[in-house]
Amino acid sequence: MDQVHRGHIAVTDHTGKILWKLGDPERLTFARSSAKPLQAIPVVESGALEHYGITQQELAVICSSHNGEPFHVKAVESILHKAGLSPDQLCCGSEYPMYVPAEDALKIAGIPRAPIYCDCSGKHAGMLITARHLGESLENYTALEHPVQQRILSVFAEMCGVETSEVQLAVDGCGVPV
């Protein structure tokens, strides 16, 4: 067997009535990286993509996790550069790439861990360009109180059909509420 996936499944109708289930469909789940496409919606809605000329490839790295391969890192650097931002402004924690050949190359070259290599750096770049475009503070953009995070919370609640007060949050591995 190649892989095993565990989970809880619910099939619902358009009203949310459960038609079929397996496991516990009421179990709370931490969204983690599966929330990245939702976290990217405010980037799109803000007009930052058009304003900074963000490409489809760059949007893809904003919406996803990446392995830190050179083309991923270049995409994140490009996003930041287009908005006049620096990789030093990323608050996602310093990492080596998950892509082992890239990690090995950095170590051989004596290059330390850095936020740009974090698998979540694209998402963070999207948050930063949104704040920059809307004239908001770039400081503490990961805090729940920051307008960037409040917009993400509103999108998440809307997509789930609940009030923002009903969304139970925790801080994910890269420092943002999810």
Q: What would you call each of these model-derived segments?
A:
Residues 14, 45-49, 84:
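Short, solvent-exposed loop/edge-beta patches enriched in aromatic
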Residues 55-177:
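Active-site-adjacent helix/loop patches that line small-molecule binding or acyl-intermediate pockets
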